[in-house]
Amino acid sequence: KVTNIIVHRTVDKVIEKELDIDNLYIINRDNNKNINMIDFNAVEVNKLLSKVINNIQNNFQNIEKGDLSKINIEELGLENYDKKNLKKGIIYRIPLGIIFNNTLLSNFGPTIPIKINLNGNISGSISTKVTNYGINNALLEISINLEINQLVMLPITTEKLSFKTSIPVAMKLIQGIVPSYYFNGIDKN
């Protein structure tokens, strides 16, 4: 839950501060201002991805260390968490029965502190999608795909958890010339 909040809030903040949608697309036009070609600006898109990943890593490292002076708790959506506990890192307390995978005892027993550590593995990619949108129009979409691996450290064992998400970054509707004649291929025999 905390990972989801931190990732989405971090992406929102980077997009809000760094993104200029018009720089993500390269549109070539002819002399009549008609669109010849649309391409994605790989340099700008990769800069955006790099900033997102670096900011997520920095936020996780600062939270793990308990260094709250370098993060904005409200910006990351962590204002409801106990700040005293956040200074120790991300720690949850779960009943002992859950650790032994026993459903009957899952809510009983003493609670055990569990510290969540980032495994140091955040990978990201950019996906693009072009969809037909009416007659001679196209909808261009750019999304950031992230995969984050974490270790949950229990007193008895450690478990690796994976978190994947795809976040839309930009959408742009490109309008082409509407033809004088359009045949949509429907054959009514």
Task: Describe each model-derived feature in a short phrase.
Residues 1-189:
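Domain-level marker for long, solvent-exposed, non-transmembrane regions
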